[in-house]
């Protein structure tokens, strides 16, 4: 029975293998372009000037993910920390976050202030609003349009379904939502929580209009980086 099931999934496995190979080539090409060498692999605290390893890996990540720049350093301890950093760096008192893929991960609730927490964005006068996905897992475009207001500064999209039962969002679907949002206000910052999403498709949200993508080295890009 198991062999029959595996045969039935042959086409799907071949598609996944092709995506993996394409992304592997993308990473290898970037490593060659930035001349990643043994000198970049030495131990470091991540502090100080002229940290060639840090500078090289950040240039590598920016190239692979098609972004202007990247922050990849040991001071960022986890995905939630990275998300909190991205939010706090781009929001000021009076601004509003609009989450258009429903409630974010539980770990982000205290960062935003959905659950009361000292030092939350809410404590600093940054408000939060949310538009849930429709029953079929698609974006509620009418709801998004109605929710965007003069205070809206940053659009939050969570690619992975996390602990919910909704479908995970594809890059193309995210791109359509970003285009819709930018038509309403081109100055809105769109941040995609890309945790679990790296390298599972041929392109990343940064290639379809996302202003920031945030991930975690404990997940897909980390590979063998995280010690057990």
Enumerate the predicted regions with their spans:
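Acidic, PIN/NYN-like endoribonuclease modules and their adjacent C-terminal/linker elements
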Residues: 19-24
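Conserved PLP-enzyme active-site core in the AAT-like
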Residues: 1-6, 10-12, 27-28, 32-33, ...
